[in-house]
Amino acid sequence: PPDSIDAAEDRERWQAILEELDILQPPGGVARSEAEALVAANNIGYPVMVRPSFVLGGRAMEIVSSDADLKRYITTAVEVDPEKPVLVDKYLNNATELDVDALCDAEGNVVIAGIMEHIEQAGVHSGDSACSIPSQTISESSLATIREWTPKVAKRLGVIGLINIQYAVIPDGTVYIIEANPRASRTVPFVAKAIGHPLAKYASLVMAGATLADINFTEEVKLNHVAVKEAVLPFDKFPGADTLLGPEMRSTG
């Protein structure tokens, strides 16, 4: 439902949901002025990830490492006011990012379609990172946490259909949730091919009233092969473009 999208994108509502579910997320804050952004960043500690609220494709997202960088970002990249807040989050150094696609029906059943491990480190936009399914380096205990949290978030948001959730795992194995997108994501075609199930078709059926049992999709598929997705980057067409990958999406496929 539309309210699920708002709950996932509105920082105050999202933080309240995660606290209610006892799910970890990186320390963060909401800033409606330059002064508030500086206070939030110094309370959290640099480096921080900054971005506008309600954004797609990582537009205007940046990792900043000092007050000077943050002031430059606010002056040149975004317009900050009470109606257009900026989100300030702790950047997790040396973390591994994971994408999870899951399917939910109206009866509250949730099945994970795939857990993808990013090859590039967390901080590179998920659309620019290569990834593998299944995960290759994440511990079973961290994966168990992801498998526990994913249905909790999907049910709490009231999702019927597909949901994408992004996680980060730091070197000691602690899992943090980065964001949830209560919709079909760009990874759905890749996961569907990897596991051999037409996820978009399944999502259409459950949105029309079918249950996961009706379509015989009731448990996570265990793969005996590895599938890899690589991004298509257009730097040969744009020779002047900065080739350093970051939180703002660069790939075209």
Go through the PLM ranges and name each one.
Residues 1-61:
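A conserved helix-loop-beta module that forms one wall/lid of the active-site cleft
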